[in-house]
Swiss-Prot record:
SUPFAM superfamilies: Hypothetical protein YjbJ (SSF69047). This is UPF0337 protein SAV_738. Pfam families: CsbD (PF05532). Residues 1-58 are annotated as: Disordered. Residues 31-58 have a biased composition (Basic and acidic residues). Belongs to the UPF0337 (CsbD) family.
Length: 58
């Protein structure tokens, strides 16, 4: 996994988790939803990079 892509994925996941927690605590469903979406985006980016690494190994 490229280091910059991995860092970006981890950053998106962390930001998403924070937004979900803050949105849930504040009762802000919009922020909570945006956090969930951002966390999912980070998860997908990480999965994409892992798949690319697996293909390169073969």
């Amino acid at each position: 996994m490229a280091a910059d892509e991995k860092a970006q994925a981890n950053g998106e996941q962390a930001k998403g988790k924070v937004k979900k927690v803050v949105g849930g605590a504040a009762g802000n469903e919009s922020l909570k939803g945006k956090g969930h979406a951002e966390e999912s985006k980070g998860d997908l980016r990480a999965a994409k990079e892992k798949a690319k690494d697996a293909i390169k190994r073969k």
